[in-house]
Structure formats: structure tokens, C-alpha cells
């Protein structure tokens, strides 16, 4: 099973994934957790470039770097893990690119979606289920402000992050069978309980 966790800045994805993984392992599943950009040596190298506020990368170059990292990530890590019977949980995937670069970034939703869906061939490589940790942009940014160092995207203005939130919710509305929206203001364990119900329904 391939699970993706999406959400805006400060939604608590890392904590949610850790808690969800722990519960699934307790149920006897083999879990592989990963993230984007990252998840492989190429992805980790690209991550540093993409998130560095000092790097001046054009929007199209940024998009293609995300896609290059994803293509390698899918082939090197995700597909082999799935073929071996493991459950893969990824912190971000296609929809983050569609929202951050396509919608909030202005490159166009349909244009970016088309590129994402053809990154490893003619057929879209999609998760079995996507959990969206939804949080108001202002609250998410307040959480992030407590950190010492913010990356390039975390430093963007609130209007950008509001567009990100609206973009994710719009994608969730278009794909209700794949998307499950969780309230990121709830305690993590409450969200994990809801997620486990959805995962068990797919088994």
C-alpha cells in the first residue's frame, strides 16, 4: 500500500507519520517512511538546493528539479518497497508540486499535473490513499515561526500559504475516493485513529 501525507506548513505531517507508522508496525505491517524532496541520494541532494532561501532558481527550473527527484525516488525506493510487500508512507508527493508550483506558484494546475502524472511513464503513479492534514494558513505559520530556521517555502507570505491550503482542499474535493481530509488542529493520535479506519477499509 502506498500512503501519502500532504498539508501546508506547520500541519504536523512529520509527527503524524511517526505516530501512524508506529501504529501500523504494531499491527504487523512492514513500513517504509520517506519524504519529498528526498528519499534517495539524488533527492536529498536536490532538496538542499530547492529549500535554500539563498538559491535563486527560476520557477520552471524549480519544477523540473522536483520532478527529477521524484522520478528517481519512485524508481529507486517506492516501487521496490511496494513490490516487496511493504507499506510506503511518503511525506509529500505529486499534489504538493501541483499545489505549490502549479496553483500557488502560478505555473498552472493542469500543466504541472500533466508533468507529474507522466514523470515515470504514460500512466500516472498515484498513491492508494492521501491524507491531507488541513490547517489554517495563519495557524500553520505561527507554529513554524517557533523554529529557528525557515526554508524558502516557509518564508513565503501568508497569502501564498492561503493559496496552498485552498489548492489542497480543491484537489481533495476532486478526488474524494483517494483523499481523506483530517483536521490538523486535533491531537495527533485522534487524526491517526481516523486514518487507521480509512486504511483498514482499503485492506
From Swiss-Prot:
Q: Which InterPro entries match?
A: P-loop_NTPase, Thymidylate_kin-like_dom, Thymidylate_kin_CS, Thymidylate_kinase
Q: What superkingdom does the record give? A: Bacteria
Enzyme Commission number, as recorded: 2.7.4.9
Per its record, what are the GO molecular function terms? ATP binding; dTMP kinase activity
What Pfam families has UniProt attached to this entry?
Answer: Thymidylate_kin
Instruction: Name the Gene Ontology biological process terms.
Output: dTDP biosynthetic process; dTTP biosynthetic process; dUDP biosynthetic process
SUPFAM superfamilies recorded: P-loop containing nucleoside triphosphate hydrolases
Functional note: Phosphorylation of dTMP to form dTDP in both de novo and salvage pathways of dTTP synthesis.
Q: Which PANTHER family match?
A: THYMIDYLATE KINASE (PTHR10344), UMP-CMP KINASE 2, MITOCHONDRIAL (PTHR10344:SF4)
Protein name, UniProt field = Thymidylate kinase
Q: Which organism is it from?
A: Chlamydia trachomatis serovar A (strain ATCC VR-571B / DSM 19440 / HAR-13)
Q: Which gene encodes it?
A: tmk
Amino acid at each position: 500500500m502506498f500512503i501519502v501525507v500532504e498539508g501546508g506548513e506547520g500541519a504536523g505531517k512529520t509527527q503524524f507519520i511517526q505516530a501512524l507508522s508506529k501504529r501500523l508496525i504494531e499491527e504487523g505491517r512492514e513500513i517504509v517512511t520517506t519524504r519529498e524532496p528526498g528519499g534517495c541520494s539524488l533527492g536529498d541532494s536536490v532538496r538542499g538546493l530547492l529549500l535554500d532561501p539563498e538559491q535563486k532558481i527560476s520557477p520552471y527550473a524549480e519544477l523540473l528539479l522536483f520532478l527529477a527527484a521524484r522520478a528517481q525516488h519512485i524508481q529507486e525506493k517506492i516501487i521496490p518497497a511496494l513490490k516487496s510487500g511493504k507499506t510506503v508512507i511518503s511525506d509529500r508527493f505529486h499534489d504538493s508540486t501541483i499545489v505549490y508550483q502549479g496553483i500557488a506558484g502560478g505555473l498552472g494546475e493542469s500543466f504541472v499535473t500533466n508533468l507529474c502524472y507522466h514523470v515515470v511513464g504514460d500512466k500516472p503513479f498515484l498513491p492508494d490513499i492521501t491524507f491531507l492534514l488541513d490547517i489554517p494558513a495563519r495557524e500553520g505559520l505561527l507554529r513554524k515561526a517557533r523554529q529557528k530556521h525557515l526554508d524558502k517555502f516557509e518564508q513565503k507570505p501568508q497569502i501564498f500559504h492561503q493559496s496552498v491550503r485552498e489548492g489542497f482542499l480543491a484537489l481533495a474535493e476532486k478526488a474524494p475516493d483517494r483523499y481523506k481530509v483530517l483536521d490538523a488542529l486535533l491531537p495527533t493520535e485522534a487524526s491517526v485513529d481516523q486514518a487507521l479506519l480509512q486504511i483498514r477499509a482499503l485492506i
